[in-house]
């Protein structure tokens, strides 16, 4: 089972209208710099206490700056019976490089 999705795969899903939740697990200061549209923001440290806000049956793409924190959150969610959860490989930074070069990078 793959725990990651590439930025190209996510873009393809969005282009065909696939319904998935974009879960941004970065800190508030990072979100204020740049965020993918229609994202749900729950900082990584708040995930355990806010787990009830997420639907375990939804397809969820978790992202952070480079893909490290998001992968940790994916493993945590899998341990809590979330079966359709993947991490955005390379994070929002790789999205900016590959998909939206005009996007703010930090």
Question: What are these regions, as identified by a protein language model?
Answer:
Residues 63-64:
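Short, surface-exposed ligand- or partner-binding patches at beta-edge/loop junctions that are enriched
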């Amino acid at each position: 089972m793959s725990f990651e999705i590439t930025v190209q795969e996510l873009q393809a899903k969005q282009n065909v209208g696939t319904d998935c939740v974009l879960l941004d697990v970065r800190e508030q200061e990072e979100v204020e710099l740049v965020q993918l549209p229609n994202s749900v923001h729950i900082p990584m440290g708040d995930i355990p206490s806010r787990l009830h806000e997420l639907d375990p049956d939804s397809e969820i793409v978790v992202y952070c700056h480079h893909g490290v924190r998001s992968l940790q959150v994916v493993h945590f969610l899998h341990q809590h019976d979330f079966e359709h959860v993947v991490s955005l490989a390379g994070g929002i930074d790789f999205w900016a490089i590959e998909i939206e070069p005009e996007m703010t990078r930090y």
